[in-house]
Swiss-Prot record:
The gene is prfA. It comes from the Bacteria. The lineage of its organism: Bacteria, Pseudomonadati, Pseudomonadota, Alphaproteobacteria, Rickettsiales. Pfam families: PCRF, RF-1. SUPFAM superfamilies: Release factor (SSF75620). This is Peptide chain release factor 1. It comes from Ehrlichia chaffeensis (strain ATCC CRL-10679 / Arkansas). It is found in: Cytoplasm.
């Protein structure tokens, strides 16, 4: 099917939906909801299609005027200027139109659960987890997103074995999803007398937050253990059994939550993380079954995949998926100015999807 035929088919579908919604008495409640959703999704696409069609019509009209032997010289000259101007606009509008036709990730509008864990490198890796946590929370503040720490395990000297947080706001998952993977840091530890460069790593997992209504978990599939929470070094920090460990028996996923003093709050947070992990597990299975979508785009987001290196001596950050290097390490890590990386990753993702857009 040609590009223009695809647009015509979409337009016909849109106006058919519009007609149906104008007479909702003919629709069941479920059909009305489904039609309304599809209509809303097509509305911005139709707006760009109209813009594209008007531009094409203008170009055809100007071309006819230019080729008409009865057109006087002055009018023909003006028509040529207008024709070339419209021709320059056409590729941009066509590109905009193709972007609007790309399949949407239904999770993009969701909030996100961000999990940061120390990898290889001991205490240096734990300190890097803290650095990444600060970078992402600063970025969240810039975007006017809200964030809440879900769980953390500190090392007692400024580092963390792991930190997880929930970030909520507009298009959080859409902007953070490409942060999943292995982040590597190269720097000289303060305790290193010889000045030798150490390499450490941390893993980041970005999961869409799933509401209870979107994913039901059977209570029979859960084993819930409660115990006293502990701090750095294993010492008890609570005299009541407030810490919660939830095991999802079918998948083997285990979530531990002990930050809150209330057992009820710890259980609620643990279930929130469990839902996100189960949803992500199913999503990864679907992606692998369909077309290995993650690998065909920017990268799999797999934790074994090194995605970015932070070199402190050179104030350099390199994203290996898109070969982008920026020499603004403090600006990015301390102030959270991540947009240049994020925009480039989104653009790369769109470019790869466009290659697979068969129209």
């Amino acid at each position: 099917m040609s590009f223009d035929n695809s647009l015509e088919e979409l337009s016909q579908k849109f106006y058919k939906l519009k007609s149906m919604l104008e007479d909702p008495s003919q629709l069941s409640v479920d059909s009305f909801v489904a039609a309304s959703k599809e209509y809303s999704e097509l509305l911005p696409v139709i707006s760009v299609i109209d813009q594209y069609n008007i531009l094409q019509k203008d170009i055809a009209g100007l071309e006819e005027l230019i080729n008409n032997p009865e057109t006087d010289h002055e009018l023909k000259s003006l028509a040529k200027e207008e024709f070339y101007e419209r021709q320059k606009q056409l590729p941009k509008v066509k590109h905009k139109l193709k972007l609007s036709l790309l399949p949407k990730d239904k999770d993009d509008a969701r909030n996100a659960i961000l999990e940061i864990r120390a990898g290889t490198g001991g205490e240096e890796a734990a300190l890097f987890v803290t650095d990444l946590y600060r970078m992402y929370t600063k970025y969240a503040e810039q975007k006017n997103w809200k964030f809440e720490q879900i769980n953390s395990s500190s090392t007692g000297i400024g580092g963390h074995k792991e930190i997880s947080l929930c970030i909520s706001g507009s298009n959080v998952f859409a902007r953070l999803k490409f942060e999943s993977g292995v982040h590597r840091v190269q720097r000289v530890p303060e305790t290193e007398a010889s000045g030798r460069l150490h390499t450490s790593a941390a893993t980041v997992a970005v999961l869409p937050e799933i509401e209870e209504v979107d994913l039901k978990i059977d209570e029979k599939d859960l084993r819930i253990d409660v115990y006293r929470s502990s701090g750095p070094g294993g010492q008890s920090v609570n005299t009541t059994d407030s810490a919660v460990r939830i095991t999802h028996i079918p998948s083997g996923i285990v979530v531990i939550q002990q930050d809150e003093k209330s057992q009820h709050k710890n259980k609620s947070k643990a279930l929130k993380v469990l839902r996100a992990r189960l949803y992500n597990l199913e999503k990864q299975k679907r992606d692998a079954e369909i077309s290995q979508m993650r690998k065909s785009q920017i990268g799999s987001g797999d934790r074994s995949e090194r995605i970015r290196t932070y070199n402190f001596p050179q104030s350099r950050i390199t994203d290996h998926r898109i070969n982008l290097t920026l020499y603004r390490l403090d600006d990015i890590m301390k102030e959270g100015n991540l947009d240049e990386f994020i925009e480039a990753l989104i653009a790369e993702d769109e470019a790869n999807k466009l290659k697979n857009l068969h129209i």
